[in-house]
From Swiss-Prot:
Residue stretches making up the EngB-type G domain: 23-194
Listed GO CC annotations: cytosol
Chain's role: Necessary for normal cell division and for the maintenance of normal septation.
Gene Ontology biological process terms, A to Z: division septum assembly
Name of this chain's protein: Probable GTP-binding protein EngB
PROSITE patterns for the chain: G_ENGB
Similarity section: Belongs to the TRAFAC class TrmE-Era-EngA-EngB-Septin-like GTPase superfamily. EngB GTPase family.
GO MF term list: GTP binding; metal ion binding
Domain of life: Bacteria
TM helices/strands, residue ranges: none
């Protein structure tokens, strides 16, 4: 897959903000704060479209990136730990819930980024169960895999495959080595990203 053009077309800050026109589907990137969503988007597009930070909570809005004038990459705010106010976290939750309820019909695939160094966190489990209830297809992207020794890596991949691998794709991924990028592109193509 070749990404020729990328354009930030809409940023959603409030649940009553208007969504952009629909295109040929949306590929959603969601995960805990500081799990690597913005870095992954930058790698996939070959551009620095998403701001990155060592501090959790940099993405505070829903960002719609038009890809090849055909479909969207949708970058959601992180959930879980972030040094932001309770009110700000509540706002993020509201816009995320609103997004999924209003745009589920146009979502092709949700990439759920999970820190592959750790077992499933409660917030991740809640999100995955919610996506199943909404009958949305998702793939689990295990981030930061380069930080694990081979034995730990094999153990964590087995752990996630035992939990979700029968029905969902598990992708070990590293921003450093670029492991998993080809699989993500492949899924985008399979699910209709042209």
């Amino acid at each position: 897959m070749k990404i020729k053009s990328v354009e930030l077309v809409k940023t959603i800050y409030k649940s009553n903000d208007k969504y952009p026109e629909s295109l040929n589907g949306e590929f959603v990137f969601v995960g805990r704060s500081n799990v690597g969503k913005s870095t992954l988007l930058n790698i996939l597009t070959g551009r620095n479209i998403a701001k990155t930070s060592k501090k959790p909570g940099k993405t505070a809005s829903i960002n719609f990136y038009k890809i090849n004038n055909s479909f969207y990459f949708v970058d959601l705010p992180g959930y879980g730990y972030a040094k932001v106010s309770v009110e700000e976290r509540a706002r993020w939750r509201k816009i995320i819930e609103n997004y999924f309820s209003k745009r589920a019909w146009n979502i092709k695939l949700v990439f759920v980024l999970i820190d592959g160094r750790h077992e499933l966190q409660k917030n991740d489990e809640i999100l995955l169960e919610w996506l199943k209830e909404l009958e949305l297809d998702f793939a689990i992207v295990m981030t930061k895999m380069d930080k694990l020794k081979n034995s730990e890596r094999a153990k964590m991949i087995r752990y996630y495959k035992d939990l979700y691998g029968e029905n969902y794709t598990i992708i070990p991924y590293s921003a450093i080595t670029r492991e998993g990028i080809d699989k993500i592109y492949e899924l985008i193509e399979i699910f209709g990203g042209v």
